[in-house]
Amino acid sequence: MTRNWSMYQDRKLLTWRLALSSMERGVPALLLYVLESKGSSPGRQGFFMVVNGEGEMEGSIGGGIMEHKFTEMARERLRQGEDLLSVRRQVHDKEVAKDQSGMICSGEQTIVMLTLGDRDMTTVGRIVGSIESYHSGCLRLSSSGMEFLPEVPDRDFYFLPGEEWVYEEKTGYKDRMFIVGAGHCALALSRLMRTMDFYISIYDHREGLETLLRNEYVHKKVMIGDYAELGGLIGSGPLHHYVVVMTQGYRTDDQAMRVLLPMEFRYFGLLGSKAKVSKMMDGYRAEGIPEEWLRRVRGPAGLSIHSQTPEEIAVSIAAEIVQVKHGV
């Protein structure tokens, strides 16, 4: 049995919703979007925010003095009623002659400021609808304005600078997380990972499990007969699939692991003590399960920070996932 849940609002969705509601109410609004980032820039490619004429803001382009400067600039342009489509380069180095951001972190980023008008309402509405329905598409920003295309691009990001510049981004959820087991640690991990724009699915076989009922952070709850069913529910995904096995015991962990071991994931973690994980891996080796499969498993899952509570365990696993995601 599968249920979709949407009580928890995602950061990007909230930002686009502010853009849409501003236009629907006739409130002037500006979109700030990071088209390109280099080096140690705090605002990475794809970061964005919306500022409207009533003082509302959602999203971020990296924070700090640079973001403050741009939000103040946006408010001034809104007060003046400017129709703006302006690309600005920001260099985070006080030694450069121009385009200084006021920061000293040595990176740089390129930001577009775009006034949102009636012409953009349909486009933004489509973006909101696609995120709400968990579909992907292509956001295109260019010297001609903004549009949304239903075709999903091959690349997550693309930017062509110049006078007739073009920026394209795959919208929707790029990263998917599969949590196997729905206990206290899974609840804490779901809460944390939902803030990081992962599409989260959780699997358990225990009907009426209190921690599953309280878990309003996942997008999808899947009740299964037993963990042998996972083979038809979770597929390989070496680029964007992140899996953590954290069931209620050794037997159910083993059942899930046997189904998932042949698959490739960007991250594959197994929660448990060192002794339990070692015993499980030794057993698989004795059975002749390929060492290549076993090397892909991170067990015990999470960075070694002597975590004890579900919340601390969730932090350790989330940190390891972020580490893997960014290739550290």
Language-model features and meaning:
Residues 2-205, 209-220, 238-241, 255, ...:
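Segments forming oxygen-rich coordination pockets for charged ligands
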Residues 59, 63, 245-249, 269, ...:
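Glycine- and other small-residue-rich loops at beta-strand/loop junctions that grip anionic moieties
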Residues 183-184, 250-251, 275:
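Residue-level detector of alpha-helix initiation sites
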Residues 202, 221-222, 264-271, 290-297:
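Short hydrophobic/aromatic-enriched beta-strand-loop microsegments
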Residues 203, 242, 247-248, 258-283:
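ADP-ribose/adenylate-binding Rossmann-like module
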Residues 207-208, 228-229, 252:
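Short acidic loop-to-helix transition motifs that present clustered carboxylates
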Residues 227-238:
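Short amphipathic alpha-helix with an adjacent loop that forms part of the alpha/beta core around
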Residues 271-328:
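Adenosine-phosphate binding glycine-rich loop
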